[in-house]
């Protein structure tokens, strides 16, 4: 007989549907199909936002505190504890389902869901836009069990051997649920794809640093019913939760999780794979000889579609024995039951799981439980979707294995090895295939066994919450994890020496002069700025004019121990220049006295200071407000020491911010320079516009911006300044490294948050009616929403009217169809058109990404501009 289950109450419901009673929307089901169908385990939806998330863009998302965060507080990338995941059984409750987010979770309100739209366009006869309501009402709904696996599952093992570009996942980056929704093929058929169509490109609503997340799969896969590719709006009978794509997502069984796009907004039918940034630079297995540097220097590695990952490979892991589990041999039963999971990709079935206790010389077969097969005998609907597994032979889910092992054999073994094979006879390899993103890691899973005086200790390869895995211990002990013997030394083999960290030598060869505190202070003036880094004394006089940050950057360090900010801010290139300025070593007693003096910078005066910033000491401001400008850009408002205090920052200059490094184990700090956007005469507070560079698999993320993003309101941020060699005085008068000159016009070239220093100059010009300086701004961005301070720029241009005092030109590389402005990068044509003929009375101000600055400089010099008329903030 057929059965319908539409909504199950998950209080004390048994995990299988047999002949027991279950209440379903006031309807009693007393007799069910004889099939034994796994139902979702009891689920408790989180209702409170965790304190960690309250100051992030995900402040609207309640979460389960048991999930293990892998990339700091934000973005949210988590896996459940492995044992807790396995104990839930075949299906995973949504609150424990692993999460891979590249950025903020779109905030979708209940009232927005009926009107959520999905656009199907591209190589189709009839482009259409479907509402969420139409997707539910006009298409057949299917319910199917599907396991999703992150391509980075078990990546920490690769990172232990050699750091990849991806963050570390343990062996729990997978979960299984009953997904409900229409088949993707039915949706696509409504738009009638053209004959030359080959791919389905998908795009989500998440707004990320490199545009919306998008990827593609082959169209013939989407149209193949046996592959089961679908759109889902339910998960285990519940509406999708925010972290899992609420209200609509793609689900691609048998392929890596990165192809199952969340918060789905577009299906674009094309004749080529997606050109989305995340499709190209994520989810690839590059050849093992390609290093991170090689992949950064040669983008062609990423654009080779042969290296893109689609189907999952065969993989397995042991859950029991657990990591750090112990077994008392005297009290143990005769047999120990080892357990774990295995999965394969492309709809292929796991056909065997094998266990070895003698380094792979011999193997024994484990039992395999295929819980997915129980749905093949069920006819009916679950949660509003028809279960159509009866005809389908493809396998979409993980399987569980187990094996009873004599404890005496465990006691005589040094490791338990696990490997699996699928029906294509693909077998897990013994050794790791390292790659630059660390994805698809699937060597034999090894649980180390140590007999400690009659007690067995079991250890997994890595520990996702620490460094207690056997791989981490072997590496620390000098073992070679690539030696084919799991890093363990053969008899007579010498330990591998750890590669030493190469420090740049900042001392001049042959300099032996010892300097005491009296001599150091005597020679530490604005004209002759001596300063200390790592106990060594440097004379910055010769670099006062040439320093990119201006003379003030060096003058501010005069007479101080500048080690912290110098080492935090400066590159290896800058450090290599230091021997030219090295003059001696500060004696030990003087260094201790100097550092004590550096620490004691508190103004003992009880009178309020009129000016906040001081060039030689850090002063404390309080973070009082965060205002979101876009999903990844915020205005941070800092309150000064009192409401009538001036910041003390000249127009065009910068201040340094210092905040604790949340990832440092030694109370380290992060220091960066910023230009505020608040008016220079604003009292009591300062506004700073900052773009948050979140971590991605191929980009480590902004160290300072991610730290600032996690700070709660009320946090103290230290400030110092001013710095910079450029200052705009008024009415065409500028200071360059302290020397005054006059200009009649500015050409301002900027991109992203690089707009902030040139904006300060532009505002100073526009707010002074007597200032006749002409300004042309070329502002380059990716999308319309990336244009910062646009309202203010529009006001300045309107204020100028026909006087040609202000002209703003925006150019976008990824502008939408409705964008009517210029498209493309800031190139030679644009600069030639708007910069005019080079002359002594025009100055070019540039600030933006390093690549843009380098490209613009090359263009400007080729057009005849002299370096003295170019300023790079």
Curated annotation (Swiss-Prot):
Biological-process GO terms, alphabetical: anaerobic respiration; nitrate assimilation; nitric oxide biosynthetic process
EC assignment: 1.7.1.3
Pfam family, one: NAD_binding_1
Residues reported to bind FAD: 672-675, 689-693, 703-705, 756
Residue segments, region Disordered: 30-61
Ligand binding (Mo-molybdopterin): 150
GO molecular function, a single term: FAD binding
Domain (Cytochrome b5 heme-binding) ranges: 512-587
Free-text comment on the cofactor: Binds 1 FAD.
Positions with a binding annotation for NADP(+): 843-852
Domain FAD-binding FR-type: 616-729
Description of how the protein assembles with itself and partners: Homodimer.
Family from the record: Belongs to the nitrate reductase family.
Protein task: Nitrate reductase is a key enzyme involved in the first step of nitrate assimilation in plants, fungi and bacteria.
Protein name: Nitrate reductase [NADPH]
Source species: Emericella nidulans (strain FGSC A4 / ATCC 38163 / CBS 112.46 / NRRL 194 / M139)
Taxonomy of the source species: Eukaryota, Fungi, Dikarya, Ascomycota, Pezizomycotina
């Amino acid at each position: 007989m057929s059965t319908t289950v539409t909504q199950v109450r998950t209080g004390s419901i048994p995990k299988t549907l047999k002949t027991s009673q279950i209440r379903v929307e006031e309807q009693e089901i007393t007799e069910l199909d004889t099939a034994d169908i796994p139902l979702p385990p009891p689920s408790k939806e989180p209702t409170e936002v965790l304190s960690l998330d309250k100051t992030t863009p995900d402040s609207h998302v309640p979460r389960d505190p048991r999930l293990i965060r892998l990339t700091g507080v934000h973005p949210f990338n988590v896996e459940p504890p492995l044992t807790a995941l396995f104990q839930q059984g075949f299906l995973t409750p949504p609150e424990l389902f692993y999460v891979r987010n590249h950025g903020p979770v779109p905030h979708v309100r209940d009232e927005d869901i009926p009107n959520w739209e999905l656009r199907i366009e591209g190589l189709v006869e009839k482009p259409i836009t479907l509402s969420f309501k139409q997707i539910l009402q006009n298409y057949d709904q299917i319910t199917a069990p599907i396991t999703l696996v992150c391509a980075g599952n078990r990546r920490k093992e690769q990172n232990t051997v050699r750091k990849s570009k991806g963050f570390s996942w343990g062996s729990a980056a997978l979960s299984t649920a009953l997904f409900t929704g229409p088949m993707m093929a039915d949706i696509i058929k409504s738009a009638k794809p053209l004959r030359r169509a080959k791919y389905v490109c998908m795009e989500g609503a998440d707004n990320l640093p490199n545009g919306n997340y998008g990827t593609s799969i082959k169209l013939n896969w989407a149209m193949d019913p046996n592959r089961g590719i679908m759109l889902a709006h339910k998960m285990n009978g519940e509406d999708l939760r925010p972290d899992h794509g609420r209200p609509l997502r793609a689900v691609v069984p048998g392929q890596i999780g990165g192809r199952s796009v969340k918060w789905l907004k577009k299906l674009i039918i094309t004749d080529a794979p997606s050109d989305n940034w995340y499709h190209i630079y994520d989810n690839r297995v590059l050849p093992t000889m390609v290093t991170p540097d090689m992949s950064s220097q040669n983008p062609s590695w990423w654009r080779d579609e042969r290296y893109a990952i689609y189907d999952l490979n065969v993989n397995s892991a042991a859950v029991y024995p657990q990591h750090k589990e112990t077994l008392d041999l005297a009290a143990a039963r005769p047999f120990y039951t080892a357990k774990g999971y295995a999965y394969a990709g492309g709809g292929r079935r796991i056909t065997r799981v094998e266990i070895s206790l003698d380094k792979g010389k011999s193997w024994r077969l484990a039992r395999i439980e295929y819980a997915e097969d129980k749905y093949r005998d069920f006819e009916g609907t679950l949660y509003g979707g028809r279960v159509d597994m009866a005809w389908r032979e493809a396998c979409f889910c993980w399987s569980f294995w187990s094996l009873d092992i004599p404890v005496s054999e465990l006691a005589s073994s040094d490791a338990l090895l696990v490997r699996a094979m699928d029906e294509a006879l693909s077998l897990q390899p013994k050794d790791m295939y390292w790659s630059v993103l660390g994805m698809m890691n699937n060597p034999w899973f090894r649980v180390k066994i140590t007999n400690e005086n009659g007690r067995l200790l079991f250890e997994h390869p890595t520990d996702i919450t620490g460094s207690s895995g056997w791989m981490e211990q072997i590496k620390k002990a000098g073992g070679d994890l690539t030696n084919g013997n799991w890093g363990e030394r053969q008899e007579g083999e010498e330990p591998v020496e750890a590669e030493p960290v190469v420090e740049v030598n900042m001392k001049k060869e042959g300099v032996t002069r010892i300097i005491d505190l009296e001599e150091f202070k005597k020679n530490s003036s604005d004209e002759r700025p001596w300063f200390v880094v790592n106990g060594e004394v440097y004379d910055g006089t010769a670099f006062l004019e040439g320093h990119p940050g201006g003379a003030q950057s060096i003058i501010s360090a005069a007479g101080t121990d500048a080690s912290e900010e110098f080492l935090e801010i400066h590159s290896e290139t800058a450090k290599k220049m230091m021997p030219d300025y090295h003059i001696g070593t500060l004696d030990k007693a003087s260094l201790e006295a100097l550092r004590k003096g550096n620490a004691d910078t508190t103004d003992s005066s009880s009178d309020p200071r009129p000016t906040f910033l001081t060039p030689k000491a850090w002063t404390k401001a309080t973070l009082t407000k965060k205002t979101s400008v876009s999903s990844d850009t915020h205005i941070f408002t800092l309150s000064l020491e009192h409401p009538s205090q001036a910041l003390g920052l000249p127009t065009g200059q910068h201040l340094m911010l210092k905040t604790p490094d949340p990832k440092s184990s030694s109370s380290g700090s992060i220091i960066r320079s910023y230009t505020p956007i608040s008016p220079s005469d604003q009292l009591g507070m300062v506004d700073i516009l900052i773009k948050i560079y979140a971590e991605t698999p191929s980009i480590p993320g902004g160290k300072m911006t991610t730290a600032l993003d996690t700070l709660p309101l009320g946090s103290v941020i230290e400030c110092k300044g001013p710095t910079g060699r450029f200052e705009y005085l008024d009415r065409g008068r500028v200071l360059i490294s302290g020397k005054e000159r006059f200009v009649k016009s500015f050409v301002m070239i900027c991109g992203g948050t690089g707009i902030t220093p040139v904006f300060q100059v532009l505002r100073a010009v526009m707010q002074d009616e007597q200032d006749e300086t002409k300004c042309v701004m070329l502002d380059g961005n990716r999308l319309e929403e990336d244009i910062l301070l646009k309202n203010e720029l529009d006001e300045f241009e309107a204020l100028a009217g026909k006087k040609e005092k202000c002209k703003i030109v925006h150019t976008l590389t990824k502008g939408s169809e409705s964008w009517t402005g210029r498209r493309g990068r800031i190139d030679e044509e644009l600069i030639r058109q708007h910069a005019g003929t080079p002359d002594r009375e025009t100055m070019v101000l540039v600030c933006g990404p390093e690549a843009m600055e380098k490209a613009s400089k090359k263009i400007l010099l080729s057009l005849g501009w002299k370096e003295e008329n170019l300023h790079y903030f």
